[in-house]
Amino acid sequence: MPLVTMKLDFGDYQRPGSNISIDTKNSIQELVMDVGRDHARFVRECERAAAAGYRLLVLVESNEKYNDPAQLERWVSDVCKRCRMCSTPRESGRRCRRGSRPMHGQTLVKILATLEKKYGVRFEFTSKKNCAKRICEVLGIEY
């Protein structure tokens, strides 16, 4: 199959004739940025994919254990790991020195579930080593 490089309205990879589009994220932190600070832009991308009849798969390069929502709820931002001032979601009144609190795993799970329900977006976590293989599997291309 020939490789064609072109701008896509949503996602990073598509196969002609398929209704699946794959958007890759190089870490959970990038995913958090997209569904947090850049939420409006990310939702527009999801809406464009749904309107065009595509199923969007967001493939996050991270530990595969995070495919389990219970494990993802325990995820802690690297920012929180370095900052003693960050509070857990249940505590109140304490803020990170930057004035805003980084996203926690519980919040991330809720946002991803909402996006899956509203727009049919699927989120999958895979190791960096297996990412290319997974892209080929989903698109039906020999690896």
PLM regions with names:
Residues M1-G17, E30-Y143:
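Non-catalytic C-terminal interaction segments of nucleic acid-processing enzymes
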Residues I20-N26:
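Conserved catalytic cores of phosphodiester-cleaving nucleases, focusing on short active-site segments
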